[in-house]
Amino acid sequence: MDNNRIGEVQRKTSETEVLLQVELDGTGNHQIDTEIPFLNHMLTLFSFHSLCNLRVTARGDVEVDDHHSVEDIAICLGQALKMALGDKRGITRYGEATVPMDESLARVVLDLSGRSYLVYNVPMEREMIGNFATENVREFFQAVAANAGINIHIDLLRGSNTHHIIEAVFKAFARALKDAIEIEPRMEGIWSSKRVL
């Protein structure tokens, strides 16, 4: 097992500047500052429930819109996860979690296959939470999937409170990822009949 499963990405555009580091074999330690309080909250939950250590510093044109910052942070998270996973030797590969948050229940199933695909079935009524546009939840996971090479299925099984719905989704993603990145000691190589992911 690689004892240094860490990915770090810096991204600078005319719209945003992001520095992100993720450590897969962590304890859920986090330092997060994105200028978007609700996204800070969700990334904190992701770190805590995945047990991945996460450091994020992001500055962007949030006075215009939060979309650029949300998407670029997700791009960096996806790239950092891909870097940290390396050749994926010994990983469990698949993860699934169903997580409640009061009246809401979300399910996330994922495969660290190297093939990016997002299925997203999460209807929400509220358009904004603070300065965070809820439509960007989909954009966030689309960017993570595309840049990490993950197949992610996200389904809202029930729910009415938008904050609770998004929180359940992020927690379920974190728990599913936690399982998928675990090392299976009996698997000496890559857990694929093709021997590559």
UniProtKB/Swiss-Prot annotation:
| Highest rank taxon of the organism | Bacteria
Asked if the keyword NADP belongs to this entry, the reply reads no
Its primary localisation, in coarse terms, equals cytoplasm
Keyword Amino-acid biosynthesis included in the entry's annotation: yes
This enzyme catalyses:
D-erythro-1-(imidazol-4-yl)glycerol 3-phosphate = 3-(imidazol-4-yl)-2-oxopropyl phosphate + H2O
Q: What is its EC number?
A: 4.2.1.19
Q: Which NCBIfam families match?
A: PRK00951.2-1, PRK00951.2-4
Q: Which family does it belong to?
A: Belongs to the imidazoleglycerol-phosphate dehydratase family.
**What name goes with this protein?**
Imidazoleglycerol-phosphate dehydratase
